[in-house]
Design a protein with these regions (language model features):
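Class II aminoacyl-tRNA synthetase catalytic cores and aaRS-like
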Residues: 1-595
Length: 595
């Protein structure tokens, strides 16, 4: 038996399980990790040892190990944490595992120590498992051991470091703002925190550091950033969580081009450190150009299927739905061409009406141009030969195409077809190569909230109107544009920002247009208005959704896959049981009782 040496009591490990290669053959190593798999081949026992960096195969041979090492190997079970000492040796071509970065070597183990035992895990700790997400979230501490999840957390850490360094190198100052602040609702509900010392009064967890970073600009910070935790009590979707992280940025004594150029430098630097090239200067697309062409204010421009305006073609149509829209001010007739979907069965096409309804449609008009040259459609009988000819030409119709229509108010029609465009791209498995970056700029300043019967801010109530539209705000608020810019990545809103109102009178006018009385405005935002009176400089900023960007960089389906401890779609933490009841004594401490 080869000579063994005691494990160095001053070092838990000398190498990680992901770094050993052929050039390390002959090296003595100490490794720690979890038993991933164990295989008993009679006289030899093989074990895959896993840590956060990877997996290394261990070999236990009674002729090359002390007696305890082989005995321990016989008893080891999955997820036991162990510590071993051994010598790196080559596996040989016949037994090389090309799926592992360490697949050319193994460690001939001469000493082993069990650091703890484990009960049987509820699922296999490996990638590609068929386990429900609820189970994974309930045992999140086990799910995080999987290589895929650990790689996601590593990428998140690396990207956060990269953007911090990019900002620091450009003289941005990292400043922390309070997590307990005043309730100033910004579109979603606040999470509120009762004060024990001041009964009946409440703090709120910030939906964003928006007002505080503006105050930092008034205070002279000039270039600020923060990796900020934000809280919003809203309905959840695949890309939403009640608490999320954004890289928050603000600058003063700047105009919109200054801010966007600085952001492009920072983002290109950070993405470049991750091996992702972001070309600069970024394309800039006007909001209405994005809506009219892609049906989305966050378009994925890696594929076509553009929205096409057919309003003029159907102005005199016998199909009343189209004719009415074509002759009504503010309404349109538009379509998209899903090439290849024209071969779908009628039943499959009919189901698309249900999809369209989720985007606000009352139905879906369509024409399927079959491969054999025939046409299948419930509406084509109403079209004249001239209308069909014009439609074919403008939509670039070929056999196998499926043309889908929307008719009605411009924005709603754009949104319906934009939703269908995205759905069809997924259904047809249209390839989207690489990453897609652009700015969408100049959003409307307001939209009409039908439920409240009032104007609402499109972004937030502190956004500066475009200079040319300031005069028209009171006469025609919906026609006013804003100094805004959204950073779009792969068809997702990855970040957003804008220039801020830095004049107290203009800010009060904006709040009044949004339905605030002077008293309410003073109650909620008096501290901001007061600060703006003390020579507030021109300012603008941005917030990058860290969770969402990491989701896109890892190719994950949900931001939950790039967060250590996310909530479910209902806002629950299945691991801890939060939210949970609190004791009567705790409620009494803050002068509350349950109704």
């Amino acid at each position: 038996m080869s000579q063994t040496r005691p494990i160095d009591e001053h070092s838990m490990h000398t190498r990680t399980c992901g770094e050993l290669r052929r050039e390390n053959v002959g090296e003595e190593v100490t490794l720690t990790g979890w038993v991933s798999r164990r295989r008993d081949h009679g006289g030899l026992i093989f074990c895959d040892l896993r840590d956060r960096e990877g997996i290394t195969q261990l070999t236990f041979d009674p002729e090359h190990s002390d007696g305890d090492a082989f005995r321990i190997a016989e008893t080891m079970r999955p997820e036991w944490p162990i510590k071993i000492h051994g010598v790196v040796r080559s596996r040989g071509e016949e037994t090389t595992n090309a799926k592992l970065a360490t697949g050319e070597i193994e460690v001939l183990t001469d000493h082993a120590e069990v650091l703890n035992t484990s009960v049987t895990p509820p699922f296999q700790i490996e990638d590609g498992i068929e386990t429900s997400e609820d189970t994974r979230l309930r045992y999140r501490y086990l799910d995080l051991r999987r290589p895929e999840m650990m790689a996601n957390l590593k990428l998140r850490s690396d990207f956060t470091f990269a953007i911090r360094e990019a900002l620091h190198n450009r003289e941005f100052m990292e400043v922390e703002t309070p997590s307990l602040f005043k309730s100033t609702p910004e579109g979603a509900r606040d999470f509120i925190v009762p004060s024990r010392i001041q009964p009946g009064n409440f703090y709120a967890l910030p939906q964003s550091p928006q007002l505080l970073k503006q105050l930092l600009m008034v205070g002279g910070v000039e270039r600020y950033y923060q990796v900020a935790k934000c809280f919003r009590d809203e309905d959840l979707r695949a890309d939403r969580q009640p608490e999320f992280t954004q890289v928050d940025i603000e600058m003063s004594f700047v105009d919109q081009n200054d801010v966007m150029s600085a952001l492009e430098e920072v983002l290109a630097d950070a993405f470049g450190r991750m091996g992702v090239e972001m070309p600069t200067p970024l394309r800039r697309m006007n909001y209405w150009d994005a809506m009219d062409t892609y049906g989305s204010d966050k378009p994925d421009t890696r594929y076509g299927m553009h929205l096409v305006d057919l309003t003029d073609i159907f102005a005199n149509s016998k199909f009343k739905v189209f004719a009415t829209a074509a002759n009504e001010e503010g309404s349109v007739v538009k379509a998209i061409n899903a090439k290849g979907a024209g071969a779908w069965a009628r039943a499959k096409i009919d189901k698309l009406a249900g999809v369209a309804s989720t985007f606000g449609a009352k139905g879906l008009a369509w024409i399927a141009f079959r491969e054999d040259g025939s046409i299948n459609s419930p509406i084509v009988k109403f079209f004249s030969d001239e209308e069909m000819a014009a439609l074919r030409e403008r939509m670039d119709v070929e056999p196998g195409d499926l043309v889908m229509f929307a008719a009605g108010p411009r924005l709603l029609s754009d949104e319906i077809l934009g939703g269908m465009r995205s759905h069809m791209a997924n259904a047809l498995e249209i390839k989207r190569e690489g990453h897609d970056f652009l700015w969408v700029v100049n959003f409307p300043l307001f939209h009409w909230d039908e439920d409240r019967k009032a104007y609402a801010a499109e972004h937030q109530p502190f956004t500066l109107p475009t200079e040319t539209d300031i005069a028209k705000i009171e006469a025609d608020p919906l026609a006013a544009g804003s100094c805004t810019y959204d950073f779009v990545m792969d068809g997702f809103e990855a970040g957003g920002g804008g220039m801020r109102i830095h004049n107290a009178e203009m800010q009060m006018s904006m709040l009044k247009l949004l339905g605030f009385t002077e008293e309410r405005a003073e109650s909620q935002f008096g501290f901001l208005m007061g600060a703006l009176k003390f020579g507030a400089p021109p300012m603008g900023g941005f917030a990058l959704g860290l969770d969402r960007v990491c989701m896109l960089l890892t190719g994950s389906d949900s931001i939950r896959d790039v967060m250590a401890f996310p909530k479910t779609a209902s806002g629950s933490d299945l691991m801890s049981g939060a939210p949970s009841a609190v004791s009567g004594a705790q409620l009494k401490d803050v002068s509350l009782r349950l109704m």
